[in-house]
Regions:
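Residue in the alpha/beta-hydrolase core beta-strand immediately N-terminal to the catalytic nucleophile
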Residues: 54, 90, 113-116
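Short beta-strand/loop motif that positions the catalytic acidic residue
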Residues: 200, 206-208
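Conserved acidic catalytic loop of the alpha/beta-hydrolase fold
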Residues: 71-89
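Acidic catalytic loop of the alpha/beta-hydrolase fold
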Residues: 210-215
Length: 261
């Protein structure tokens, strides 16, 4: 367990793997924590210096008031890399984490060696959905949306066969401060990188669960089409968080991708 006070923000992070290995930054999704990348972090730590962290307002990282933007959250990622003395890193992100990763590839391409964009899109809308979700959370609390969110994160078969994992992620959601979730959701609501995808110049792998209804395979196809040279892998029998639901398949796709760089 490690914490850093970076530009006034307490950030919880973890570094695994040899210090001399290529850095790999893992960015988690809205409402989760760096633990959603735990299987990949462990598997890849032999060949990478794996850096995981909790986004502001998530996990054990400090929350801040007000709406967040992708630029703000991408800045947090760069500040952490600066704190750790990392000039350039491979970057992988899921959902909101994937939007942050896209932002880094577009606005700080010199800092990014490659991108893995999991179950994400250049824009996740419509905006009214996020406003309605925020209103529901403020009215009835985080617990009122847990079942609906879990049904998007995981397939019914996984929830039935691995209830302990699904319930653990549900507990994580329930405990998250409502305003911290809403602040981060504003970054998703307002983000749209569709017109700038062509500026991503690094090798890119797009991953998507075949049963993802939040950012479906069609959105992944659009990312692949918009990013020069991008590759696409569809993870079978997975919804929005394949890193948890199908960890071996995600790790295998990432290992194959990195081997080809």
């Amino acid at each position: 367990m490690a914490f850093a006070l970076i530009k006034g923000l307490s950030v919880h992070y973890r570094v695994e793997g040899p210090a001399e290995a290529p850095p790999l930054l893992l960015i988690h999704s809205l409402g989760s924590s760096m633990e959603m990348w735990a299987p990949q972090a462990t598997a890849l730590a032999g060949k990478f210096q794996v850096i995981s962290y909790d986004l502001r307002g998530h996990g054990l990282s400090e929350a801040t008031d007000g709406s967040h933007t992708l630029e703000l959250l991408a800045g947090d990622a760069l500040n952490l890399l600066d704190h750790l003395g990392v000039e350039r890193a491979h970057v992988a992100g899921v959902s909101l984490g994937g939007m942050i990763a896209q932002t880094l590839g577009i606005q700080a391409g010199g800092r990014v060696r490659s991108l893995v964009l999991g179950d994400t899109a250049s824009v996740i809308g419509p905006k009214s959905n996020w406003d309605h979700r925020a209103a529901a959370i403020r009215a009835d609390g985080m617990a009122s949306l847990v079942d609906a969110i879990l049904s998007r994160w995981f397939t019914p078969g996984f929830i039935e066969s691995q209830p302990q994992i699904a319930r653990g992620f549900g507990a994580m959601l329930t405990r998250m401060p409502a305003e911290a979730y809403i602040s981060a959701s504003c970054a998703v609501r307002d983000g749209d990188m569709t017109a700038a995808l062509g500026h991503i110049a690094c090798p890119t792998l797009v991953l998507v669960g075949d049963q993802d209804v939040s950012t479906p395979p069609a959105a992944a196809e659009a990312l692949k089409a918009g990013i020069p040279g991008a590759k696409l892998v569809v993870i079978e029998n997975a919804a929005h968080i394949p890193t948890v639901e199908r960890p071996e398949a995600v790790t295998s796709a990432m290992v194959s991708f990195y081997a080809g760089l």
